[in-house]
């Protein structure tokens, strides 16, 4: 038997060339230390920033700090099952979540896993959670109304589709209630409105009690609004990385509708807790602290999230994503770090006040401090026609009311202003879970601005409103339909509406 040296060396070369290939297939690293939801990992040389990595037992993490000798990984889950020396694998994918209509009616966590016990999610597509916002060219200015069903908001601080309107106030002032009522107000459109007007709702609960989230979902379910809503929950007991990720995950789910020529609305409840979670992660990752110990890029955290809410132009499908971020203030301090940041990013704010809430003015909107910077161009013309003067009248009323506490003998015009203001304030009150259609709001505010309430006692205003609405719904449905179809108060409609209100006012007296 002769030995062929060339053949042997060729085989050896081939084997040497393939040696050690298996070990490189999934790049791995080793846990150096773990605690407080953060793991320091040695190895993972080629890991990308924001890449998903996997720990033993299927626990996921995200590489955030890429340092010269180790990688700082935040852990999406319990860190008690991870120990020093564990092997960490790269997944090669940036953190993504399932998106699409299959998520409607479901409650999921920040990674898109179902937590409502209704079986697996049927999703055809996955999206990265952190993508760049649309540029300037694909956008269009906000011009379609996004009705909340609340008179105080739709008349005075209107929100348009694609706008970012901040809801800000102390704890227990009804911030979540505004989002909930807005979701419920979309029910009639989903039942029998055109597809182009349907608004899909996404609710992100960050750092809230589980009981609160369960209550929110229960109300949506009972009122038939869960079928067009998605709830993302990162509750108070979830790790900080989940609370940090939840808004981005919700945004990706909302963007699916925006990019497919549909309209979506997302409520982030609330971003103060996301900032706190991000601060905790940053400090544990040893990033340098800034003002109020928040990291230097906490402004960028919120701006890159909220910039993704947009109205796209017709070439890009004309879809929209409207954002209602919530910020909780401490003792009405709007000048703290996070509130000022988010106020400067958004297109206006609805400012809720504890004092008003306890006076029984609910929704407790402070009309003087609340603004909508782009909403007026989206307001329905009919609403503009009737509500134009309200804001001024209410501002004058507040000024006079403060002044009238001192003087007893007021002239007739001041007295008239005070009377009108008190009745308008009463008119803007609204119980929870009872959103009104735009045409009904127009009719009610028309009655208020045209002096029909001036002769009625303040405590009878609510009764007058309820009576007027039921009379319009039953006997004058044609007037409401005309306002809805025309979207403006023509002379003809105005005359009909005036006649209807006149008739009711006579019978009410």
UniProtKB/Swiss-Prot annotation:
The record marks 370 as: Required for activity. The keyword Transport applies. One of its GO terms (molecular function) is ADP binding. ATP binds at residues 169-176. It is found in: Cell inner membrane. It catalyses: ATP + H2O + 4 H(+)(in) = ADP + phosphate + 5 H(+)(out). PANTHER family: ATP SYNTHASE SUBUNIT ALPHA, MITOCHONDRIAL. HAMAP family: ATP_synth_alpha_bact. This is ATP synthase subunit alpha. It comes from Brucella anthropi (strain ATCC 49188 / DSM 6882 / CCUG 24695 / JCM 21032 / LMG 3331 / NBRC 15819 / NCTC 12168 / Alc 37) (Ochrobactrum anthropi).
């Amino acid at each position: 038997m002769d030995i062929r040296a060339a053949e042997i060396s060729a085989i050896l070369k081939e084997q040497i060339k393939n040696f050690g290939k298996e070990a490189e297939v999934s790049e791995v690293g080793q846990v150096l230390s773990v605690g407080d939801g953060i793991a320091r990992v040695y190895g993972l040389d080629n890991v990308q920033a924001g890449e998903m990595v996997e720990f033993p037992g299927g626990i996921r993490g995200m590489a955030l700090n890429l340092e010269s000798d180790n990688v700082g990984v935040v852990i999406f889950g319990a860190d008690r099952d991870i120990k020093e020396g564990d092997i960490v694998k790269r997944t090669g994918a940036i953190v993504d979540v399932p998106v699409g209509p299959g998520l409607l009616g479901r409650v999921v966590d920040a990674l898109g896993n179902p937590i409502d016990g209704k079986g697996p999610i049927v999703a055809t597509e996955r999206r990265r959670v952190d993508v760049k916002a649309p540029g300037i060219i694909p956008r269009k200015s906000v011009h379609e109304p996004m009705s909340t069903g609340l008179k105080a908001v739709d008349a005075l601080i209107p929100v348009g589709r694609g706008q970012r309107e901040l809801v800000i106030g102390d704890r227990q002032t009804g911030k979540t209630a505004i989002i909930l009522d807005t979701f419920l107000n979309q029910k009639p459109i989903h039942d029998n409105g055109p597809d182009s007007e349907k608004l899909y709702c996404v609710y992100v609960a960050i750092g809230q009690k589980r009981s609160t989230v369960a209550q929110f979902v229960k109300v949506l379910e009972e009122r038939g609004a869960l079928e067009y809503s998605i709830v993302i929950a990162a509750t108070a007991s979830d790790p900080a990385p989940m609370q940090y990720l939840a808004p981005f995950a919700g945004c990706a789910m909302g963007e699916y509708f925006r990019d497919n020529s549909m309209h979506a609305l997302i409520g982030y409840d609330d971003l103060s807790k996301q900032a706190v979670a991000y601060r905790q992660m940053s400090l544990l990752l040893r990033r340098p602290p800034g003002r109020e110990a928040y990291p230097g890029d906490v402004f960028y955290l919120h701006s890159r999230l909220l910039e993704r809410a947009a109205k796209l132009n017709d070439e890009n499908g004309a879809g929209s994503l409207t954002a209602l971020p919530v910020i909780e203030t401490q003792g009405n301090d709007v000048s703290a770090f996070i509130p000022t940041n988010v106020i400067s990013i958004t297109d206006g704010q609805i400012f809720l006040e504890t004092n008003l809430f306890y006076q029984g003015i609910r929704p407790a909107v402070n009309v003087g401090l609340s603004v909508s910077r782009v909403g007026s161009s989206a307001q329905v013309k009919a609403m503009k026609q009737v509500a134009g003067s309200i804001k001024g009248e209410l501002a004058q009323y507040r000024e006079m009311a403060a002044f009238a506490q001192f003087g007893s003998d007021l002239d007739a015009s001041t007295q008239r202003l005070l009377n009108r203001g008190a009745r308008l304030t009463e008119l803007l009150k609204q119980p929870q879970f009872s959103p009104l259609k735009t045409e009904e709001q127009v009719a009610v505010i028309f009655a208020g601005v045209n002096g029909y309430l001036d002769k009625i006692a303040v405590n009878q205003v609510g009764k007058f409103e309820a009576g007027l609405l039921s009379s319009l719904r039953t006997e004058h449905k044609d007037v409401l339909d005309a306002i809805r179809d025309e979207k403006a108060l023509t002379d003809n409609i105005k005359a009909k509406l005036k006649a209807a209100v006149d008739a009711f006012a006579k019978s009410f007296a």
